[in-house]
């Protein structure tokens, strides 16, 4: 049974109903409809913590989806799963790929910054301040990009940039 038919969550049900209506009334190819169905099912599985199932759906959506903008969100969600699983190198790769297709994803820049900041903190714990500084500088660059896209967001990042003297 497709995942879209087993959702119990009210928001997921509402999203599924609206998505199904839109799929019927907006002129799209059958491939686009199938890609969206896999994407929707991937989001549903991801929200429930079923990451393996979500990845299967996202990979299938990637195979079918041709629009770069839509692909960017699929790649971004794959990055989120790898982040949640602690697979930071893979996550960064997917965030980069998402940004190649859509450079206006502040959340991807933010997530990349968070990973770099985390790695900087790890380097400090290991006693390597030079490596830590490099990671922190990279985090700062990503946060600046996220903030440039959405100036009212990422207040904690803005504060960190100011406190550490990285805000220009």
Curated annotation (Swiss-Prot):
UniProt entry keywords in alphabetical sequence: Chloroplast, Membrane, Photosynthesis, Plastid, Repeat, Thylakoid, TPR repeat
TPR repeats, residue ranges: 35-68, 72-105, 120-153
Subcellular location: Plastid, Chloroplast thylakoid membrane
Main location: plastid
The keyword Plastid belongs to this UniProt entry's keyword annotation: yes
InterPro entries to which the protein is assigned, alphabetical: PSI_Ycf3_assembly (IPR022818), TPR-like_helical_dom_sf (IPR011990), TPR_rpt (IPR019734), Ycf3/AcsC/BcsC/TPR_MFPF (IPR051685)
Coiled coil segments of this chain: none
Pfam family, one: TPR_1
Any one GO CC term of the record: chloroplast thylakoid membrane
UniProt keyword Calcium present: no
An individual GO BP term: photosystem I assembly
Annotated SUPFAM superfamilies: TPR-like
Topology term for the membrane: Peripheral membrane protein
Transmembrane segments: none
Similarity annotation: Belongs to the Ycf3 family.
Functional summary from the UniProt entry: Essential for the assembly of the photosystem I (PSI) complex. May act as a chaperone-like factor to guide the assembly of the PSI subunits.
Name under which the protein is recorded: Photosystem I assembly protein Ycf3
Organism this protein belongs to: Glycine max (Soybean)
Phylogenetic lineage: Eukaryota, Viridiplantae, Streptophyta, Embryophyta, Tracheophyta
Gene name as annotated: ycf3
